[in-house]
Amino acid sequence: MEKKTFYITTPIYYPSDKLHIGHSYCTVATDAIARYKRLQGYDVMFLTGTDEHGQKIETKAKEAGMTPQEFVDHIVEGERGILDLWKLMNISNDRFIRTTDDYHCAAIQKIFKTMYEKGDIYKGTYKGKYCTPCESFWTESQLVDGKCPDCGREVKDAEEEAYFFRLSKYADRIQHLLED
């Protein structure tokens, strides 16, 4: 009889600073589920990792006098970094993914190219109020006294070229799935 499979993942954490208790809580909860499923006889794939791209990392790296890659390497692999913490906590993940890994970059580029060629992704411009520490765009109505509703810091007007997913292409299928 073939084993049933079970896939579980934490969010891929954003390593702009040392982890906090929320990261540990989420990872321990995910680990507990993975271990339980293994005890039930499932073939489990437990993934965790880091999303190592973004303005906040670039800014923090510059402040630390490092390149972005050096900065995230220190957070992930350095003494008392993420990998040390997960080892100390005996986390049973099967895979630790880093979005800067060559294989990950190649896979994402292939997926992106395919979706772009099919018209699922298109380039456009996004405008809004931007909070750099939170890496979030906000509308005017979402702001609290003109500041970021999450952290209370000042926001700035920002406009950037971005890629968008053409959700409208799948509207009928999504509607059908929601109704059934």
Positions of predicted regions on the chain:
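N-terminal, positively charged nucleic-acid-binding surface of large information/translation enzymes
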Residues: 1-180
